[in-house]
């Protein structure tokens, strides 16, 4: 099921695309704490002592109403950030946040070292991800239509 389908099935206000990372790297990410159903019970942005290794990929599906309200409320916050401000605000307001555990290709490029490593992997003799092989899948344009359903995405 796509994360768009999961959002609808769970009546989620926000769906967070996540991926397990090694525990020793979890403090570099926003981490998601969930219950048994995948409902987000807490979100910690780059915690010193993470309670989870389920890392946010920085990819979110919001209902327009919830996103708009959070952005309006946070507009005066300098350096407003989804992980530090928007997601915690949604949780505090009692919104339904769910995690979608992605199991495809994804690389963090948040540090110079990880950016370099991702580039080196792409030029490997047999890269883990081949853009030309996946061209149609990874070049879809995402559009917004009122009361629409997202049918395909990464």
Language-model segments: which ranges?
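Left-handed beta-helix
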Residues: 39, 64-154
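A generic structural signal for well-ordered coil/turn residues at beta-strand boundaries
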Residues: 28, 55-56, 103, 150
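A conserved catalytic-core signature of glycosyltransferases
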Residues: 56-57, 62
